[in-house]
Amino acid sequence: MRLTDEDKAVRREIEDWQHADASVAAQAIDWAMTPVDWAVDKTVSPETMEKVTDRIHQFLSTLTDASEWTHEADDILAAAEERGLPAQTVSDLRHQPITELDPLARSRFRQNTILAALGGGGTGLAGTAFIAADIPLLFTINLRLIQQIGACYGFPLEGPMFRPLVLSIFNAAASGGREARNEALREVSVAAAAFAGDLDYKGRVSGTFRDQNRHFPREIAKALVERKVGQTIPLAGAAVGASVNYWFTNETAKSAFMCARALYLDWKERK
């Protein structure tokens, strides 16, 4: 199908995001965290750093387990119907105009970012003992967020086969770098081809991607740990935990939003 003028405008927005520098929010947190980073170096043990990193690795490794992908789409379908977008299944939504789907997807942002921030603030008050416990909750919220946004555009991202796509979105969110965004959009293109051809999505098959897929958890962990360990600093813990969780979930929402829109447009062009 040919893209409409509205579709082409969205494509330009995606390209702007793809080539942009790190977000203002990410830069602000890096600046604000400078004194905390100094305190971390002085007070946080290597064992604590390793524990947090391991928790991130453990969660991302569970994405090969089908039980981790449980997701109820009824709330998405109900929200779509309230907006005049009736659909019997999630897949039906991909036949709606993208200008109607964008507000539906954006409606998923606020609840998830607040939920993640509250979790980060609560565990931050508990200090070192609970910083690692915060990681599974944060990533569970963000996995569901990615699935919700994908569903808003008519693409049910359910099952371990979507692990490469989800990891690439997490990596784009955590790193904020252009190469990570490029990698995510390349993965989106593969997924779009699978959806358009009614084929099973298998992720990119090049040796280079297989190598990167193994490294993604490590890269995501590195980007987050430098910020998350600030929760172990006395008095700063709750504020740092809440702000970092809010930042990461907001970045995940934006990355998933752009990737889901790209998936919609790539699929549409192939039909």
Give names to the regions the model predicted.
Residues 119-132:
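Transmembrane alpha-helix interface/packing and boundary motifs in multi-pass membrane proteins
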Residues 132-139:
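Internal active-site segments that recognize and position negatively charged phosphoryl groups
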Residues 1-119, 144-271:
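Terminal, membrane-proximal amphipathic helices
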